[in-house]
Regions:
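Membrane-proximal low-complexity regions enriched in glycine and acidic/polar residues
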Residues: 40-112, 116-118
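N-terminal membrane-entry
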Residues: 157-174, 182
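Alpha-helical transmembrane segments of integral membrane proteins
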Residues: 8, 12-20, 40, 166-179
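Extreme N-terminal signal-anchor transmembrane helix of membrane signaling/transducer proteins, especially
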Residues: 4-26
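N-terminal membrane-insertion alpha helix
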Residues: 21-38
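Cytosolic signal-transmission helices at domain junctions
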Residues: 183-192
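Extracytoplasmic
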Residues: 88, 95-164
Length: 192
């Protein structure tokens, strides 16, 4: 084989493998974005169901405006404009998150309009040995009866749902390294 032909094969092979690796990394990033949106939608639907259940059995109706505000990727506020019990809220949150397959730790707090502060915060962990007690939630203006939910492990939960993509990317990196090693070995032996 001539040197020019070998160089062409080496360059084409490297370009192809690097192109596949870049495409894989872009797909992994897009998969993360999609998982993040799916998680947000599941949380939104679950919190809306919790708000509806808190209104059941009362004389008040669920407001027509959206009661859920997404403050950040892992922090949601639900305005219910209705008095509710903390134990009932916790039960509804657990059951709705379980229905939606949201299997990550969360913490919540509810606003007490009498003391004008967030109270009764609780950390709900799927791992029973993990008991966090310090929960801080800021107070929000213009809301009277509301609760807040935070998912402290959202990012690790999303990464764990993308294990397949990371394994595939790692395998492609290994293939690239084997290819480079093979080319270096061929060039060192000068069998071309």
């Amino acid at each position: 084989m001539k040197i020019n032909r070998l160089n062409t094969i080496i360059i084409l092979g490297l370009v192809a493998i690097i192109g596949i690796l870049i495409a894989q990394l872009l797909w992994t990033r897009q998969a993360y974005t999609i998982e993040e949106k799916k998680f947000s939608q599941k949380v939104y639907v679950s919190l809306l169901e919790v708000a509806k259940k808190l209104y059941e059995g009362t004389n008040n109706e669920l407001p027509s405006e959206n009661p859920i505000q997404k403050v950040s990727n892992d922090y949601y506020i639900v305005n219910v404009n209705n008095d509710f019990d903390a134990e009932v809220l916790e039960f509804y949150l657990k059951s709705e998150f379980e229905k939606a397959s949201i299997k990550t730790d969360f913490e919540y707090a509810m606003y007490n309009c009498q003391s004008d502060e967030m109270v009764y915060g609780n950390y709900i962990s799927l791992d029973k040995s993990n008991n966090k007690t310090s929960v801080f939630f800021p107070k929000h203006k213009n809301l009277v009866y509301y609760f807040a939910v935070r998912f402290p492990n959202e990012r690790s939960f999303l990464f764990s749902s993308l294990k397949f993509w990371f394994i595939l990317s790692f395998a492609l990196i290994i293939i690239l390294l084997v290819y480079v090693y093979s080319i270096v070995t061929i060039l060192q032996q000068k069998k071309y």
